[in-house]
Amino acid sequence: MSIMQVEVVSSEQNIYSGEASFVVVPTVQGELGIYPRHEPIMSLVRPGALRLTVPGEDKEVLVAVSGGVLEVQPDKVTVLADVAVRSAEMDQARAEEAKKAAEAGISQAKDDKALAEAHKALAAAIAQLKTLDYIRSHKK
């Protein structure tokens, strides 16, 4: 089985570093499925669920990403995410509350910095909600 090295890093921490046999990344062009030996590309990441298939494990590793940059090399995938959260750390109620707070922050922003922070928080909340929806729709 072919494998590749995958790094998912946010501005706060290293979220995932290890091997994978398949990765799905939400990009601005749509979901991109990546196998080992993929052609080199770079793309912008959109909010959503990043999915990793780890060799020898029967379940996917899920990470909510709010945006960022994807770099693909034949033997390595790197995602530099604005915000990234492992699925085990997510909570539906907290994500919904964060989305409401971010939407309020956008409407009440007094300057560009506050508006940018509110948009960043909204993207993070949307990414978590999309990941939680994916988990719910794929339960066995």
Swiss-Prot record:
Kindly state one GO CC term assigned in the UniProt record: proton-transporting ATP synthase complex
| GO molecular function ontology, one term from the record | ATP binding
Q: Does the keyword Ion transport apply?
A: yes
Q: How does it sit in the membrane?
A: Peripheral membrane protein
Secretion signal, residue range per the UniProt entry: none
In which domain of life is the source organism classified? Answer: Bacteria
Quaternary context: F-type ATPases have 2 components, CF(1) - the catalytic core - and CF(0) - the membrane proton channel. CF(1) has five subunits: alpha(3), beta(3), gamma(1), delta(1), epsilon(1). CF(0) has three main subunits: a, b and c.
Q: Function of this protein?
A: Produces ATP from ADP in the presence of a proton gradient across the membrane.
Which Pfam families does UniProt cross-reference here?
ATP-synt_DE, ATP-synt_DE_N
Which keywords does this chain's UniProt record carry?
ATP synthesis, Cell inner membrane, Cell membrane, CF(1), Hydrogen ion transport, Ion transport, Membrane, Transport
- NAD as UniProt keyword: no
The organism named in the record is Neisseria meningitidis serogroup C / serotype 2a (strain ATCC 700532 / DSM 15464 / FAM18)
**InterPro entries of this UniProt entry?**
ATP_F1_dsu/esu_C_sf, ATP_synth_F1_dsu/esu, ATP_synth_F1_dsu/esu_N, ATP_synth_F1_esu_C, ATPsynth_dsu/esu_N
The listed locations are: Cell inner membrane
Q: Under which name does UniProt file this protein?
A: ATP synthase epsilon chain
Name the protein family.
Belongs to the ATPase epsilon chain family.
